[in-house]
Amino acid sequence: MNLAAIAKNYSMHNGESGAIVPYVPPPYNFASAPTFSQRTSQMESVSLGILNQAMSSTTGASGALKDEKAAFGAMAERLRDPEPIRQIKKQVGIRTLKNLKMELATMRRKKSALKITILISGCVTLATSMVGGLSIVDNEIFEDYKKNDWLMKAIHGLNLLCTTVLLAAGKISDKIQEEISRTKRDIAKRESYVSAASMSWNGDTEVLLQGIKYGDS
C-alpha cells in the first residue's frame, strides 16, 4: 500500500481530527426565566426615569411641585439601593420623621406668634404715625405737643421701636417660612422613601405605584 492510500484511509477513520481547524459545534442557548440581574436592570431603568423627572428644572415651581420632585428623588434612591441599605434607611427614616414633624409644629407656632407680633407692631406704628401727622396739619395739637414735650418724645420713641420690631419680626418670619418649606420637603422625601421601601416589586410599574404615600396623602 502506498503513502497516498494510507493517508486516505486515516482520514476516513478519524473524520475531522485531521482538519487544520477542528470543527466546534455552536453553543445552544436555552430560554430561561428572568434572572436577578435582569430585574435589577429593570429597577435601574425605572430609577433613571424617575431621577430624570426629579432633576428637571424647578424654576418658577411652587412649593408643592418642589416637594413632588423631592419625592421623585426619594423613589429613585429607593430603587437604586440594595435591600439591606433600604431597610436601614427605612428604620432611620421612621425615627427621623417623628422629630421632623415635631420641629415643624414648633416652627409653625413660632410663626403664628410672629404674625401676632407683626400685627400689633403694625397697628401701633400706624397709630403713632397718624398722631405725628396730625401735629403737622393741626396747630392746636402741635401746641399741645410743645407744652408736653415728653409726650411727643414718647410717641416718636414708640413709633421707632414698633417699626424696628416690625422689620425684625418680618425677617425672622421669612427665615422661619424657609425652614418650614425645607422641613416639609424633607418630610415628603422621607415618607416617600419609607412607603416605597415597604413595598415589593415584581416588574409591573402599576403595582409599584399603588399605595405609595406622598406628603399628607
Curated annotation (Swiss-Prot):
Tell me one Pfam family matched here: Orbi_NS3
What family classification does the UniProt entry report for this protein?
Answer: Belongs to the orbivirus NS3 family.
Role noted for this protein: May play a role in the release of virions from infected cells.
The molecule here is called Non-structural protein NS3
Q: Which organism is it from?
A: African horse sickness virus 4
Q: What is the lineage of its organism?
A: Viruses, Riboviria, Orthornavirae, Duplornaviricota, Resentoviricetes
- The gene it comes from is Segment-10
